[in-house]
């Protein structure tokens, strides 16, 4: 009788099979628990303790993955255009540094610039790099100075005051300065852009500027990349292109400051209730206040190089340094020294603070001549025009006088205003000296200055009839 036997490997023992499966499962779990960087294997815990640990620690790796990696410095620089004048296009930011770096600035000379997104022409001007995705920076030349007043036509004379719409202001003088600036090789410029970021095409632009009361006329025709003077310019706008042989009477009709004053809208309730910008008077403060304009009244400044400039200084504006050249009106210092003895001198300009404040720091560093300074932000904006409302001074208007080469500037207090001829370069000018006797007499009388100013200059007689 033959017995059949099986080999040990072929015997099916259920106990051994279960043990083998358990060993294989534990081996795979140990491999899964091994850390990525090596190290001891972690035991795969089960039960209540394991559930608690998973509940506490389970969401941590997910949060770490959701947190983005820190941005590099180059990537952070992409967001710098949020604080510049460059219009936003809505496209993905270009990962290229668009930054202006100033190098050493010595003795008031403008330093050189490094602009990674612009090419430098042979004449020293900057040309936007077409390879970059960001639109060119908006040109802001001339905006630091006092703007030219917008023509107040019958079509818009009923506009409300305080409508801050600088886009409606026809700053013809500033456009002329832009044309002059682009002819100077040493000064950096950039292409003007529209509000949607598209650059204006180069076209022949004829600009005629009748500055203030028609005393100076500038006419230039040039091929330049310039924005339109206004959007749009009405046919009867005073600063549209005019014939070169226009007479003085025609120029006066182009922009009559007294027509502007006649139709200026009244101040709003909010403007009437503005808090005074000046501190209260002290015992040493003179009783009478004299408000002085800056540009073309005391000085004449230009971004073009002036050979007879009394001083020059750099101004940093919108990441670009502009060199400002200054002429001082004859008897400028003598006038201020005498008037500061009997008047509280207040400088009130429609220019930017970044320019005017720096100029005053040079002319009057110890504030011995000018006690207070007010700038464009203290003006009232009416239809894009900046008007100096004397109520913001917080002073007695019966003892307050303003001297300005633009009568429109004191449109709300015409009886307090003394007009003065605009000054640019006449070395024989003595208008400041001629005003000293009258100003000294007003203090001696110790009366309301307004009737005396009205009788002397008779500005109300120049207003057009109703």
Swiss-Prot record:
GO terms for molecular function: phosphoprotein phosphatase activity. Pfam families: NIF. It comes from the Eukaryota. Residues 81-97 have a biased composition (Polar residues). Its EC number is 3.1.3.-. Belongs to the CTDSPL2 family. Probable phosphatase. This is CTD small phosphatase-like protein 2. It comes from Gallus gallus.
């Amino acid at each position: 009788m033959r017995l059949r036997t099986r080999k040990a490997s072929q015997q099916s023992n259920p106990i051994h099979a279960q043990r083998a499966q358990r060993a294989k499962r534990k081996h795979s779990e140990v491999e899964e628990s091994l850390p990525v960087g090596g190290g001891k294997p972690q035991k795969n815990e089960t039960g209540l303790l394991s559930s608690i640990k998973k509940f506490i620690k389970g969401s941590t790796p997910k949060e770490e993955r959701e947190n983005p990696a820190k941005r590099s410095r180059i990537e952070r620089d992409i967001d710098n255009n949020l604080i510049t004048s460059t219009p936003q296009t809505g496209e993905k930011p270009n990962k290229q540094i668009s930054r202006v770096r100033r190098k050493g600035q010595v003795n008031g000379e403008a330093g050189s610039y490094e602009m990674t997104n612009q090419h430098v022409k042979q004449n020293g001007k900057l040309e936007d790099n077409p390879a970059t995705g960001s639109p060119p920076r908006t040109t802001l030349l001339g905006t630091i100075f006092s703007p030219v007043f917008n023509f107040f036509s019958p079509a818009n004379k009923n506009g409300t005051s305080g409508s801050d719409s600088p886009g409606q202001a026809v700053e013809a003088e500033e456009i002329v300065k832009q044309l002059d600036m682009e002819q100077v090789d040493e000064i950096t410029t950039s292409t003007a852009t529209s509000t949607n970021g598209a650059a204006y095409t180069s076209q022949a632009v004829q600009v005629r500027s009748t500055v203030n009361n028609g005393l100076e006329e500038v006419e230039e025709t040039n091929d330049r990349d310039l924005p339109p003077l206004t959007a749009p310019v009405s046919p009867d706008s005073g600063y549209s292109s005019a014939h070169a042989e226009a007479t003085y009477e025609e120029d006066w009709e182009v922009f009559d400051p007294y027509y502007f004053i006649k139709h200026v809208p009244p101040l709003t309730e909010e403007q009437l209730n503005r808090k005074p910008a000046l501190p209260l008077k002290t015992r040493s403060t003179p009783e009478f206040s004299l408000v002085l304009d800056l540009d073309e009244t005391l000085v004449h400044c230009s971004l073009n190089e002036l050979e007879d400039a009394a001083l020059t200084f750099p101004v940093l504006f919108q990441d670009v340094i502009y060199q400002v050249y200054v002429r001082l009106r004859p008897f400028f210092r003598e006038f201020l020294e005498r008037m500061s003895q009997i008047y509280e001198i207040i400088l009130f300009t429609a220019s930017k603070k970044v320019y005017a404040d720096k100029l005053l720091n040079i002319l009057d560093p110890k504030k011995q001549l000018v006690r207070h300074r007010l700038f464009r932000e203290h003006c009232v904006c009416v239809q894009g025009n900046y008007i100096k409302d004397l109520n913001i001074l917080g002073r007695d208007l019966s003892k307050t006088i303003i001297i300005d080469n633009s009568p429109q500037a004191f449109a709300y207090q015409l009886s307090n205003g003394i007009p003065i001829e605009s000054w640019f370069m006449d070395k024989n000018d003595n208008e400041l000296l001629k005003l000293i006797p009258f100003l000294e007499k007003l203090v001696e009388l110790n009366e309301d200055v307004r009737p005396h100013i009205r009788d002397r200059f008779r500005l109300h007689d120049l207003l057009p009839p109703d």
